[in-house]
Amino acid sequence: MASTFSFDIVSDFDRQELVNAVDQVIRDIKGRYDLKDTETTVELVEESINVSTDSEFTLDSVHTILREKAAKRNLSQKIFDFGKVESASGNRVRQEIKLKKGISQEIAKQISKLIRDEFKKVQASIQGDAVRVSAKSKDDLQVVMQRLKQEDYPVALQFTNYR
């Protein structure tokens, strides 16, 4: 039997689910009467989604559709970082929606401090863009998970490598 148990706290998303959500958004835009003739494009590139359309009103509609499709695919709304709306050529607007992945050092320190302050039998260590949490009891780890789910961090947290 293992002497200590651990899990990792990460901020990640399922890339394939995001691809599927963006494909559904594109299909939805082509099928909706109010968006058909707007020549709206939604493009998924490496670390962002680029949206180009004819007005800010249709851009808001695309945001709504994207949020709905992402939610249906169990993707957190916190992965989207909506950038500034830019004017493009010919009365068009475009926006880059960055995709947030990984836990920043600042947030990792907040998580680690919360664990140290509230749970004396649990250790937290920052490892790159993840936080490793370890304890002698699985029950302690489950309590930590429940506590972290109650907090509202600017990134989506997932718990992996439960050992």
UniProtKB/Swiss-Prot annotation:
This is Nucleotide-binding protein Npun_R4736. HAMAP family: YajQ. Keywords: Nucleotide-binding. GO terms for molecular function: nucleotide binding. It comes from Nostoc punctiforme (strain ATCC 29133 / PCC 73102). It holds the Pfam family DUF520. It comes from the Bacteria. InterPro entries: DUF520 (IPR007551), UPF0234-like_C (IPR035571), UPF0234_N (IPR035570), YajQ-like_sf (IPR036183). Nucleotide-binding protein. One of its GO terms (cellular component) is cytosol. CDD domains: YajQ_like (cd11740). Belongs to the YajQ family.
